[in-house]
């Protein structure tokens, strides 16, 4: 089944390019860890999901590109064409001459209704080229104007027109120090609207990705492309083909559906975080060796301690014993608290994958009391390695990972709202203060719901 990707705004289009490039490079790199037949099946499965064939034989991304300024879209189309490996389709992009000026209301209330027909027609055309549609993957920022405001509008229209198709939004959480003065307003408006219209929110924090670039990739001058390539690697490690539940010879057909079924058991809980190991520079990788036991030990501790990467994991945090608070709970540092999960998916790729022991992720102490571990944990596998790593593991977690950053962003936005700061920038484009209050109420309920999962 195929996935149609919608790239929105500067952030969405730049990340979208890196995602398709990473998917294509991985599926076409030489692999010595599986048979030629298995490798060809892997390539075919990737192609069905993310690409379609054009008459000239060059794979074309199943994507629609949207921005309110032409510069980034033109650059993105050009880079894909110049790669010589794959391309975007003709007539799959929409852009205008005027951006949204980091104003969520302008993207949502002005650009959205004005360009709805053109954008939705492009998406419909792409959908009609799929033999079978798994759903939509919408890549956007959370804090700007076009990606966030228009992105929320487009997601709502996708829900209206394709209510039976799955919608996953991949969202970039802004730097905590702030790129835009109104980013907290934009963020709460984006999240609250997506919570009503999307099936799942796959969230990446800029601060965390930046640390991976600096600490794990050893990059000195970190660019947006560096950040986007780390994001693309993490997304590829989740969405590239894996074996179906009942066979080690056939790849699963419906990755979005399978992922949602495992990870989003209740509409109150839609926030997913991704962790991936190992991630390191090519120079470091040349001198590194990995065991499944070591990788999974680190990944499990990253989960329960809310660590963003392998470096700096707090090994003091332990799951709670029955009837007792978790070790680490009494810490003065709130980030050291035990992270309770609703559901987890581990994706394993590489040599000897069937020998990997994931029993540590089935511990009932990791999960909220109202779900059995058999329902809360899933593992996907393939012996085909991903990218340049002989062994790699990814974790997609529906847990309390994002409660603290969400609570902080709601608090900052409320402080601004209570003093009526910058509200006029939104009300002049048709928004009312009641819209803000609705957003606050919804997100405060999300924080409370995740907080109720466990200790």
Curated annotation (Swiss-Prot):
The keyword NADP does not apply. It holds the Pfam family Tubulin. Gene3D superfamilies: Helix hairpin bin (1.10.287.600), Tubulin/FtsZ, GTPase domain (3.40.50.1440). Keywords: Cell projection, Cilium biogenesis/degradation, Cytoplasm, Cytoskeleton, Developmental protein, GTP-binding, Microtubule, Nucleotide-binding, Nucleus. GTP binds at residues 143-149. Found in a complex with TEDC1, TEDC2, TUBE1 and TUBD1. Belongs to the tubulin family. This is Tubulin delta chain.
């Amino acid at each position: 089944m195929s996935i149609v990707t919608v790239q929105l705004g500067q952030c969405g289009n730049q990340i979208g390019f890196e995602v398709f490039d990473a998917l294509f490079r991985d599926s076409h790199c030489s692999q010595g860890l599986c048979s030629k037949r298995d490798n060809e099946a892997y390539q075919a499965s990737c192609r069905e999901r993310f690409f379609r064939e054009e008459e000239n034989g060059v794979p074309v991304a199943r994507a629609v590109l949207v921005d309110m300024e032409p510069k980034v879209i033109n650059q993105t189309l050009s880079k894909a064409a110049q790669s010589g490996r794959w391309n975007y389709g003709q007539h799959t992009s929409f852009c205008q001459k005027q951006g949204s000026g980091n104003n969520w209301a302008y993207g949502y209330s002005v650009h959205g209704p004005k360009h709805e027909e053109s954008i939705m027609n492009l998406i419909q055309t792409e959908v009609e080229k799929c033999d079978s549609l798994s759903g939509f993957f919408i890549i956007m920022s959370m804090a700007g104007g076009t990606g966030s405001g228009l992105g929320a509008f487009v997601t709502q229209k996708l829900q209206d027109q394709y209510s039976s198709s799955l919608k996953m939004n991949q969202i970039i959480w802004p730097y905590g120090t702030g790129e835009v003065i109104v980013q907290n307003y934009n963020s709460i408006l984006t999240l609250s609207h997506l919570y009503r219209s999307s099936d799942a929110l796959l969230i990446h924090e800029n601060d965390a990705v930046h640390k991976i670039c600096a600490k794990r990739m050893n990059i000195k001058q970190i660019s947006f492309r560096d950040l986007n390539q780390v994001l693309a690697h993490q997304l590829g490690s989740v969405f590239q083909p894996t074996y179906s539940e009942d066979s080690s010879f056939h790849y699963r057909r419906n990755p979005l559906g399978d992922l949602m079924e495992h990870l989003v058991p209740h509409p109150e809980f839609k926030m997913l975080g991704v962790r991936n190991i190992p991630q390191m520079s090519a120079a470091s990788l040349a001198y590194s060796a990995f065991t499944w036991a070591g990788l999974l030990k680190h990944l499990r501790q990253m989960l329960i301690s809310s660590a963003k990467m392998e470096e700096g994991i707090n090994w003091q945090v332990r799951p709670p014993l029955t009837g007792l608070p978790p070790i680490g709970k009494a810490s003065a540092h709130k980030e050291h608290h035990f992270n309770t999960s609703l559901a987890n998916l581990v994706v394993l790729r590489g040599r000897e994958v069937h020998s990997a022991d994931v029993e540590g992720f089935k511990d009932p102490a990791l999960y909220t009391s109202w779900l059995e571990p058999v329902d809360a944990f899933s593992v996907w596998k393939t012996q085909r390695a991903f990218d340049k790593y002989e062994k790699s593991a990814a974790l997609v977690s529906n847990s309390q990972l994002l409660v603290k950053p969400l609570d902080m962003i709601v608090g900052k936005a409320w402080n601004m709202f209570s003093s009526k700061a910058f509200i006029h920038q939104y009300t002049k484009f048709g928004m009312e203060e009641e819209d803000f209050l609705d957003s606050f109420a919804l997100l405060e309920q999300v924080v409370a719901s995740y907080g109720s999962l466990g200790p």
